[in-house]
């Protein structure tokens, strides 16, 4: 697809969020209006007709997915995200056809089948209609305006083919070229967008890199007017955050929210992460509710705190340190499933998406979708922070969680198990499959897609395909309960992808169910795995569900788990699963919470309406540490270069990081001496980083290096005094008339006063001083 875009004028930044309006784009006959923000084209040579898992022969183009509206033609759709100025309201969007032609293919577009959850429930409702003999009626659809970390994104669906019916004859029309036009006006008044007030070093460039691969008009990223925050000057010293989110003190990258009863264990995790160069703070819900502004309930109070932490501290990652009985989730009602009735979904997405308040209409229900002209609660599902949950209720469980994270990230160089992927895929439909039956959907299809499209081209990882049958796809071993338990117990796999049926307490593995008791009994030790479960409800953390039992296991099990809290719709869920693993294997996104959040962004345009993508967004959750660095190969051994020792006072500390003689760029390096100084940074292309380090007493500084597929390396650097060294410990202020002073005697320096300063000094170098003089 060819694309070009026009430059936007610089617009002053206004905080705000456009309403998530979902409006049908003007008809093709309407006179085009608005500013062209994007032009694109489709090439006839890129049209392919492929048979999908349901046996439908569908038209496809690169970068599209089928419009899965039951009972309507399954035309392809390309979902565009376009960057537009953040200070503007988007009032309308049109897709203008620039060139079309009659498609000569004799193929007809089949009708989409009902959506089917993995429990067999069918959803036949559609949000679009086929009327007037042309489908879709327009070449495109405006699906909403969203904010991600202060960047405004417009989502547009474009259809490269339309079906025409006239006189009983069906034909296809091909969209050769098109323009996206938007009418925008300066936003009046403020709107509710979370904005960075503290500058996070490196984040603007990092955000730009994400957007350049996400949006269809990446040329707009450079020079985009977005509030990055101010650089906060912090006094030299150890990590010293303020007591509550503010622009004072050290910045914070990782926020752990828990309860008073669990805080001591999570502080161990905070100390470990801080030593890696991820400055981390533990805050309890009791402290938040007692000392911070309260919302309508505890969930809103916690979200308000997270929003302040994002804006003022610079927080990017949040761990909800407690199960649903400790930190209650936000429940949202979704009427997409079942077709008659609705489902209450516990979603931690509420704590990650910080724009708006998820209750625009001010009633008792949060997270209501747009229905017709009613915009509902105008929820923006773009995640500003990357959230995970530690589903623990006791101090012992919290200790297990922390121990497992530390052990996983301390895996020795050369370990083989992180370099292997295990697939456990069964036939999804028919759900009562027996060997020899006709198969309408085999989970092995999704596994093979991942192997062929991602693992083989992007990694050197080994993989094991355990399938219920080899009727359609070759297996490496048959999937049975006994075989899966034995394989997991052996601890040979770092990533496990289960594709099949499931419920709160089980996942189906061909001939039997893998139950919570099986997860409890695993003994794979420190060889813990990431499990991504494409099944119904095994991630329902408001119950003692299967996925949380994997993570709670003290003798092995999983290091983290990703899955659905309620029903899952396999075809739709697979889009998100494939995108997650594409980011992990092919695009160097190795921190699990960030990877999960970014895997959802391409599909955000389909979330305003109460339909299958909104359902999937709300349902999938991460049970685990969101900062976890996921292994996708054997960890590399590191060689560190640093001074053999440091003196008291200011030191320039050059650090080099290499592997087998080659420099390692992008490694996170932290130098810390408790109570004295704390510095961290990332190595450049030459594998180097340098710190100004200011210890005030003798002792040891510790250098810690981590990164993508890098075995954690540490180096202790002694700090020894070369000469006596004085440290200022306090400064007395006298303004009461003594010592030549004049003032009001309150001990504060004020205008018009003459003050006497009395320093208190401590010799911290270990030497002897016979005299002291100063000027």
Which residues are covered by each model-predicted region?
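Cysteine-dependent hydrolase recognition
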Residues: 29-716
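Short acidic, flexible loop segments centered on an aromatic residue
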Residues: 668-675, 762-775
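Short structured motifs
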Residues: 140-141, 640-641, 741-745, 758
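Short beta-strand elements of extracellular/lumenal beta-sandwich folds
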Residues: 752-766
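N-terminal secretory signal peptides that target proteins for export/translocation
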Residues: 1-9
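Bacterial N-terminal signal peptides
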Residues: 14-23
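Proline/serine/threonine-rich low-complexity linkers at boundaries of modular beta-sandwich domains
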Residues: 629-637, 720-735
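Short, solvent-exposed loop/linker segments at the N-terminal edge
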Residues: 644-650, 737-740, 744-753
């Amino acid at each position: 697809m060819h694309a070009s875009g026009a430059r936007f004028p610089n617009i002053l930044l206004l905080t705000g969020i456009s309403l998530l309006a979902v409006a049908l784009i003007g008809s093709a006959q309407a006179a085009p209006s608005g500013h062209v923000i994007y032009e694109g084209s489709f090439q006839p040579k890129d049209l392919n007709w492929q048979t999908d898992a349901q046996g439908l022969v569908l038209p496809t183009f690169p970068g599209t997915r089928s419009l899965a509206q039951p009972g309507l033609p399954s035309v392809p759709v390309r979902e565009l995200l376009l960057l537009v100025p953040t200070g503007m309201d988007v009032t309308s969007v049109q897709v203008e056809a620039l060139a079309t032609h009659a498609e000569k293919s004799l193929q007809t577009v089949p009708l989409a089948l009902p959506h089917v959850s993995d429990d067999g429930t069918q959803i036949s409702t559609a949000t679009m209609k086929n009327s007037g003999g042309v489908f879709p009626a327009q070449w495109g659809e405006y699906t909403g305006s969203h904010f991600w970390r202060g960047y405004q994104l417009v989502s547009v669906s474009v259809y490269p083919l339309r079906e025409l019916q006239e006189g009983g004859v069906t034909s296809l029309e091909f969209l050769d070229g098109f323009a996206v036009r938007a009418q925008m006006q300066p936003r009046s008044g403020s709107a509710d967008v979370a904005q960075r007030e503290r500058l996070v070093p490196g984040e603007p460039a990092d955000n730009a890199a994400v957007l350049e691969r996400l949006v269809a008009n990446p040329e707009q990223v450079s020079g985009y007017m977005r509030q990055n925050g101010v650089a906060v000057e912090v006094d030299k010293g150890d990590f010293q955050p303020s007591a509550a989110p503010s622009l004072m003190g050290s910045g914070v990258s990782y926020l752990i929210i828990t309860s008073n009863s669990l805080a001591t264990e999570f502080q161990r995790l905070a100390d470990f992460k801080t030593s890696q160069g991820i400055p981390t703070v533990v805050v309890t819900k009791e402290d938040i509710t007692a000392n911070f502004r309260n919302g309508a309930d505890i969930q809103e109070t916690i979200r308000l705190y997270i929003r302040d932490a994002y804006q003022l501290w610079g927080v990017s990652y949040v761990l909800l340190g407690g199960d649903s009985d400790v930190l209650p989730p936000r429940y949202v009602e979704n009427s997409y499933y079942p077709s008659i009735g609705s489902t209450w979904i516990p979603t931690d997405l509420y704590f990650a998406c910080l724009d708006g308040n998820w209750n625009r209409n001010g009633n008792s229900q949060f997270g209501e979708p747009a229905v017709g002209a009613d915009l509902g609660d105008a929820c923006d599902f773009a995640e500003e922070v990357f959230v995970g949950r530690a589903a623990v209720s006791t101090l012992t469980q919290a200790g297990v969680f922390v121990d497992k994270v530390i052990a996983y990230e301390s895996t020795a160089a050369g370990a083989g198990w992180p370099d292997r992927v295990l697939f456990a895929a069964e036939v999804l439909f028919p759900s009562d499959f027996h060997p020899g039956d006709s198969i309408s959907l085999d989970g092995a299809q999704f596994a093979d897609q991942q192997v062929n499209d991602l693992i083989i081209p992007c990694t050197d990882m080994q993989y094991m395909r355990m399938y219920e049958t080899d009727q359609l796809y070759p297996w490496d071993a048959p999937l049975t309960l006994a075989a899966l338990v034995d394989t997991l117990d052996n601890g040979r796999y770092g990533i496990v992808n289960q594709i099949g049926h499931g419920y709160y307490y089980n996942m189906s593995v061909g001939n039997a169910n893998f139950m919570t008791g099986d997860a409890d009994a695993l003994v794979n030790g420190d060889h813990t795995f990431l499990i991504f479960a494409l099944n119904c409800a095994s991630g329902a953390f408001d119950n003692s569900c299967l996925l949380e039992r994997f993570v709670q296991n003290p003798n092995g099990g999983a290091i983290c788990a990703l899955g659905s809290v309620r029903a899952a719709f396999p075809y739709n869920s697979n889009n998100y699963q494939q995108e997650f693993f594409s980011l992990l294997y092919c695009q160097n996104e190795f921190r699990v919470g960030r990877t999960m959040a970014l895997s959802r962004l391409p599909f955000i345009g389909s979330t305003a309406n109460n339909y299958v993508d909104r359902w999937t967004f709300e349902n999938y959750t991460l049970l685990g540490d969101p900062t976890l660095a996921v292994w996708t190969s054997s960890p590399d051994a590191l060689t560190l270069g640093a001074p053999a020792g440091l003196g008291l006072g200011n030191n320039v500390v050059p650090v080099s990081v290499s592997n087998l003689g080659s420099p390692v760029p992008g490694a996170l390096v932290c130098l810390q001496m408790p109570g004295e100084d704390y510095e961290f940074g990332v190595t450049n292309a030459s594998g180097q980083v340098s710190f100004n380090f200011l210890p005030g007493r003798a002792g040891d500084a510790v250098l810690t290096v981590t990164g993508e597929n890098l075995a954690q390396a540490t180096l202790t650097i002694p700090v020894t005094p070369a000469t006596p060294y004085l440290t200022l410990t306090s400064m007395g202020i006298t303004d009461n008339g003594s010592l030549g002073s004049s003032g009001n005697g309150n001990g504060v320096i004020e205008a018009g006063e003459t003050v006497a300063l009395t320093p208190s000094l401590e010799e911290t170098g270990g030497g002897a001083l016979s005299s002291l003089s100063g000027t």
